[in-house]
Amino acid sequence: IRPLIPLLIAAGILLGGNGLQGTLIALRGAQEGFAPSTIGLMGTAYFGGFLLGCLAISRIMKAVGHVRAFSALAAIASAGTLLLVLMIDPATWSAIRFASGFCFAGLFTVIESWLNSGVANRDRARVLAFYRIIDIGAVTGAQFLIPVFGADGFSVFAVMSIMITLSLVPVSLGDRSNPVPPADVRLDLGRVWRISPVGVIGCVAVGITNSAFRTLSPVYAEQIGMSVTNVVTFVSAGIVGGALIQYPLGYLSDRWERRAVLLLTTAGALGAALALVFFAGSGPLANFVLVFIFGAFAMPLFSLSAAHANDRA
């Protein structure tokens, strides 16, 4: 794992910057008077760019290699972060978020393909588990930079740009090998549907739900009267809940009927979401507990749906 340490450091810095951006966009947008629907559309733009980036990055890596692809995409993402605070306008922010989604999809693909190519099969699960720990830790920790620097000024945007730029250093100075790029992606949604309608419906529904949570949960928390510190704690509680329960639910679904686990997990997420609606005014602690439970049930649903589809592939 030692040769991969620079790459994992870069991943941690980059993931922290990306996780910080999602929450900050929602908070700053609300402060600027953007409607929740407008902030939601910005989230849609980000994930649209992310989808396109997933489809295009293999060609970029084949053309210029991993290091150059990473450097170019990180530079664009860093510049876009600064443009957010220089050009405060919903349409401009949506365009920047689309470009950011494209860049971050490419950056994560570069990192993950590099990790996979640089580790033996016997060590792969441990390395990827360590990567996921870094992911959750960086995203959760970065949230608390918002109350430190404030969401209403330039400083926190500069910090995000610095984090994205610094991720270039370990990649540029670390392992100079050039792994084989991933194969081109071809979508055949009809075939996927024929293999597992339940898996397709689950992945699509969970993708919509969880992306809406990541985009709009800061706005919801602010509108029910939470302070900035409590807003980022609320968002972090949902993320941590999903991280902690991923493995136990995966373990259960490997041993029980997977559709039954999917049904029970969906019911748990629905119950927690309804409880959040009814107990919104009950104080921060109740909301932290409920959003933790929501994340614990909602976040693993994608993995469970994908596993169900893979069972039939």
Predicted segments — roles?
Residues 147, 161-181:
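C-terminal membrane-cytosol helix-exit motif in multi-pass small-molecule transporters
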Residues 68-82, 161, 260-275:
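Structural signature of the two symmetry-related core transmembrane helices
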Residues 7, 91-97, 199, 283-290:
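Short hydrophobic/alpha-helical segments at membrane-entry points of transmembrane helices
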Residues 1-47, 197-202, 210-220, 224, ...:
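Helix-loop boundary and gating motifs at the non-cytosolic
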Residues 259-303:
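C-terminal transmembrane helical hairpin of 12-TM major facilitator-type secondary transporters
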Residues 106-119, 299-313:
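Intracellular juxtamembrane helix-capping segments at the cytosolic ends
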Residues 53-66, 150, 245-257:
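Helix-to-loop junctions at the C-terminal end of transmembrane segments
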Residues 98-133:
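Cytoplasmic helix-loop-helix junction between adjacent transmembrane helices
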